[in-house]
Amino acid sequence: MSHSACPKPATARHSQALTGEIRIPGDKSISHRSFMFGGLASGKTRITGLLEGEDVINTGRAMQAMGARIRKEGDVWIINGVGNGCLLQPEAPLDFGNAGTGARLTMGLVGTYDMKTSFIGDASLSKRPMGRVLNPLREMGVQVEAAEGDRMPLTLIGPRTANPIAYRVPMASAQVKSAVLLAGLNTPGVTTVIEPVMTRDHTEKMLQGFGADLTVETDKDGVRHIRIVGQGKLTGQTIDVPGDPSSTAFPLVAALLVEGSEVTIRNVLMNPTRTGLILTLQEMGADIEIIDPRLAGGEDVADLRVKASKLKGVVVPPERAPSMIDEYPVLAIAASFAEGETVMDGLDELRVKESDRLAAVARGLEANGVDCTEGEMSLTVRGRPGGKGLGGGTVATHLDHRIAMSFLVMGLASEKPVTVDDSTMIATSFPEFMGMMAGLGAKIAESGAE
C-alpha cells in the first residue's frame, strides 16, 4: 500500500480540558506475534483485542499465504494453524506494506524452511535496513537475494537443513532477537540468542505459552541467554491482547499537557520492558495513577488515570531507550511544554525507524518554535511551560505514523495550531486515533473536513 498517493493533512488546535475514559487498541507487538504463532501452531487459536491496523493485517495475510486459515467471527479472530515445520511456500511475494516488525519476524520464521520466499513493502519499508536480521539467517544457511544495502525487495532461499547457531545480538533489538528465535523453531538442535541489553520479551513469553521448549537465563553480568529447542510442537492458544503502550502514549501526553484534563485509559500493557515513557513522565512530575494492576495472559496490565500536570525537564538515562524507543517523539512533545531542559540520549535506533525519526522530530519542533538541539544520537529540548508562542508550523511526517500523532498532540496544547502534512498513515498502528481523541474533546480536523 502506498500512503503517498493522496496525502491528507490534519491540523490540531488549542483545546479545552480533555475528559473521559478510553480503551486503547491492542498492542502491536503482541498482535503481530498472535497471528504468526497462531498460524504456525497446531489446532485453533482464538484472539480478542487484536490491533486491526494495516501492519498487523499484512502479517495475517502473509500467514494465510503460507497455509494458515484465518477468519473473524464477531470480535474474535480464529486461526487454524499449519503446525510447526509445515508452512507452505507462498505463490506470490509477501507484501508487508509499512510493517517492519511483520517483515523482519516473518523473515526469521520462514528463512530456515527449504523453500523460496520473497518480501516486498512500501516506499518507507523498502528504505529500511534488513541486514541485521539477514546476517544471522545467513549463518544458519539461508541464501539471500536483496536490493542494495540488504533492503527490500528481497528473496530468501532456505537450506535443506538449517544450522543451529548461538547469536549475540549486536544492538538492542527485539526484532533481531525474535527473528533468530523464530528461525530456531524449524532448526534441529538448540538455537541460542545472547542479549546484552534486555528488550521487549513478548516473543519469549508467547512462545512458552504456545508450548515451545524455550528457556531464559540471566548471567551474573545481566546478559540474557535465550535457548530454544527446534522442531517441537506448538499448540493453539486463547489470547486477549492488552492495550498498546506505544499508542497509549498519545492520549496520555495530551491529557498531561491540556489544562484541566483528566482521562482514564483502560487495559494498558505494563510489561516492564515497555514502560520507560510512563516512568520518565512521572520523573518529570506527571500525575499518572496506576489502577488495578493485574496479570492477563502472562502479561502485566493496568488502568491509568492521567491528570494535567506541570512538567519539569529531566535527563533520560540512555539505557532506558529500548523500553521506550517508539515513545521518544511524543516525549519530545511533552518536553516542549516542560520547565527547563530535557536531554534524551542513546537514540541511534531512531535513525532507522519508519523515517529518520530523530531528524523528523527535531525539524518538526523547530518549525513550531521549540528551542532544541539535535545531536548524532541525542535530542535536547528546552521547554516553554504553557506552550506560549509554540505552534504555527507544518510538520513533514515522512510517512511516519508516530511523527503525525505526536505533533497533533502538540497542537492541542500549543498557543497556535500545528499542522501535519499527512495523516493517512496513522491507520497503520492506531486507526481509531482521530475518533478517540475527538471523543475526549480534542480539536483535530483533517483538511477538507471541519
Swiss-Prot record:
UniProt GO BP: amino acid biosynthetic process; aromatic amino acid family biosynthetic process; chorismate biosynthetic process
Binding of 3-phosphoshikimate, residues: 28-29, 33, 173, 175, 326, 353
Cellular component aspect of the GO annotation: cytoplasm
SUPFAM superfamilies in alphabetical order: EPT/RTPC-like (SSF55205)
Pathway(s) this gene product operates in, as recorded in its UniProt entry: Metabolic intermediate biosynthesis; chorismate biosynthesis; chorismate from D-erythrose 4-phosphate and phosphoenolpyruvate: step 6/7
Annotated phosphoenolpyruvate binding sites: 28, 100, 128, 175, 357, 402
Annotated Pfam families: EPSP_synthase
One GO MF term attached to the UniProt entry: 3-phosphoshikimate 1-carboxyvinyltransferase activity
InterPro entries assigned to the protein according to its UniProt record, in alphabetical order: Enolpyruvate_Tfrase_dom, Enolpyruvate_Tfrase_sf, EPSP_synthase, EPSP_synthase_CS, RNA3'P_cycl/enolpyr_Trfase_a/b
Subcellular location: Cytoplasm
Enzyme active site: 326 (proton acceptor)
EC number: 2.5.1.19
Gene3D superfamilies hit by this protein: Enolpyruvate transferase domain
Principal cellular location given in the protein's record: cytoplasm
Catalysed reactions listed for this entry: 3-phosphoshikimate + phosphoenolpyruvate = 5-O-(1-carboxyvinyl)-3-phosphoshikimate + phosphate
Keyword tags: Amino-acid biosynthesis, Aromatic amino acid biosynthesis, Cytoplasm, Transferase
Quaternary organization: Monomer.
Function: Catalyzes the transfer of the enolpyruvyl moiety of phosphoenolpyruvate (PEP) to the 5-hydroxyl of shikimate-3-phosphate (S3P) to produce enolpyruvyl shikimate-3-phosphate and inorganic phosphate.
Sequence similarity: Belongs to the EPSP synthase family.
PANTHER family reported for this sequence: AROM/DEHYDROQUINATE SYNTHASE, PENTAFUNCTIONAL AROM POLYPEPTIDE
Entry protein name: 3-phosphoshikimate 1-carboxyvinyltransferase
Organism: Brucella abortus (strain 2308)
Gene name tied to this protein: aroA
